[in-house]
Amino acid sequence: MNSLPNLLCKMVEFLQKQSLILSKNSRDGRINSAFNEDEIFNLLHAHFRINSPNMRDWFDFSFEENETFYPVNIKITNLSTDNLNCKLGIYYALTGKLPHFDNEIRWANFFSTIKENLAENSQDYYFLIINKNDTKDIFATSLKCLNELTPNGNNLPFQANWAKNRILVHRNFSQVKAFILGTMGQSFALRARAYDEFVLNFPEFKVN
């Protein structure tokens, strides 16, 4: 059974007690969110033993607890649907191994690498969720314990609606595989269906 690490729970409690004021320096919400993530990291770094990420790392910060590595992604959100395009976090959760590739790996290589290394493990990819419309509304979750994932053929491999993912769902490893890989498969089926519909209308442009 997966559960949240103690230190991450303490971070949530700490942030909930703060009077967080998130900067809004840009009309672009994505730019503001990226800047806000840095603000949250700096606040946490000043009070907890967390590791700064390198430029191309696949997490916003990490820490060790009981000799286990915990990667965490900060999400500043209005609790709507976000893309979860992190192949490296998915790989870590499904294999228990640190990825030796970057997020630009081709899908075919990504699938084969997961298949070769897929193994029951206790590792996970964590999310620290902060509601930008109510900064007291903060919670943490993880990829394996999400209540639901949303398949999307336009935003691979899938998405998550944070408002529907407050409660942790504990799964055994067989259930985890079905949950993550099954949703991923649905997304690729949607992508393929779009191509089939295109060819149905424009058969002269079918790729041979």
PLM ranges: what are they?
Residues 1-59, 65, 70, 76-208:
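Nucleic-acid endonuclease domains
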